[in-house]
């Protein structure tokens, strides 16, 4: 899904994936299970980091996967 919330300008080719946090890891990392079943390691980015949003297991989030490593990504927003 391409930038569903229009929070920040989408980078061409950037694909937002829906997922749910399954674990909070050390050093500000999170394990997220995407809706297609994949597990990725992510970190908070952008507005989520600046707002100090509390992210706990089972929180629904939007994730952008890294281009070079599809097993890593960044959390760009919380889902409603």
Give the role of each language-model region:
Residues 26-32:
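Short aromatic-glycine-enriched beta-strand elements
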Residues 19-21, 75:
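Conserved hydrophobic positions within beta-strands
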Residues 48-62:
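Short nucleic-acid-contacting surface segments enriched for D/E, G, S/T with interspersed K/R
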Residues 38-46:
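A short macromolecule-binding patch
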